[in-house]
Amino acid sequence: MADRVLRGSRLGAVSYETDRNHDLAPRQIARYRTDNGEEFEVPFADDAEIPGTWLCRNGMEGTLIEGDLPEPKKVKPPRTHWDMLLERRSIEELEELLKERLELIRSRRRG
């Protein structure tokens, strides 16, 4: 399969149809700015909802210059090991387990 190559054609990259006598889809241009001050434009369809943030080519996130600011994301507090333990056992059960383990350790030391 690697022997056969389509020469002179880039699949999916180029349209060989001319742009004459064709109306392009209506577009709107959204301008974004990154934290380091770089501004860039992204074309959207006229009826598309413009997002408040967009990832720039340099990898930084840009915010919309004109329009609604994005809503801050809700941050969930991190679940700790203790939180997960309390989901499975009550404090009374944990105290009982602690007593059992302490008795086992003490009996090993004696014997």
Curated annotation (Swiss-Prot):
It comes from Mycobacterium tuberculosis (strain ATCC 25618 / H37Rv). The gene is rbpA. Binds to RNA polymerase (RNAP), stimulating and stabilizing the formation of stable RNAP promoter complexes up to 2-fold from principal sigma factor SigA-dependent but not alternative sigma factor SigF-dependent promoters. Increases the affinity of core RNAP for SigA, increasing the transcriptional activity of RNAP. Unlike the case in M.smegmatis or S.coelicolor, has no effect on rifampicin inhibition of transcription. Has no effect on E.coli RNAP. InterPro entries: RbpA_sf, RNApol-bd_RbpA. Oligomerizes at more than 3 uM; this requires the C-terminal 32 residues. Forms a complex with the RNAP catalytic core, specifically with the beta subunit (rpoB). Interacts with free SigB, probably as a 1:1 complex, and also with free SigA, probably via its sigma-2 domain. It holds the Pfam family RbpA. This is RNA polymerase-binding protein RbpA. GO terms for molecular function: bacterial-type RNA polymerase core enzyme binding; bacterial-type RNA polymerase holo enzyme binding; nucleic acid binding. Residues 80-111 are annotated as: Required for oligomerization and to complement a conditional disruption mutant. Disruption phenotype: Essential for growth, it cannot be disrupted. One of its GO terms (cellular component) is peptidoglycan-based cell wall.
